[in-house]
Design a protein with these regions (language model features):
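Negatively charged, low-complexity tracts enriched in Asp/Glu with abundant Ser/Thr
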Residues: 1-36, 42-81
Length: 81
């Protein structure tokens, strides 16, 4: 799973080149670890909610309020296209 987490981080950083701000927050203290990703299309603005939010568990488990790696990867790839 570490490779997939690094891939998500890389895509978040690439989004900046396209004018988007994608925040990547790793939380190791949560059971099994998780990554929260917040997407601001066309850049972050004060007092504006993100266009999209994802929470992915490092183990890849999907449950209520959690996204799969595949879902987040597909969204970010589309954002980078």
């Amino acid at each position: 799973m570490n490779e997939r987490v690094l891939s998500l981080l890389s895509m978040c950083m690439q989004a900046k080149e396209k004018g988007h701000h994608v925040f990547f927050d790793y939380s190791p203290h949560v059971d099994r670890g998780q990554v929260a990703i917040s997407v601001y299309k066309n850049g972050w603005k004060e007092d504006v909610d993100p266009d999209k939010r994802f929470i992915v568990t490092i183990s890849g488990e999907v449950g209520y309020g959690k996204s799969s790696f595949a879902e987040v990867e597909a969204y970010l790839k589309e954002l980078l296209a």
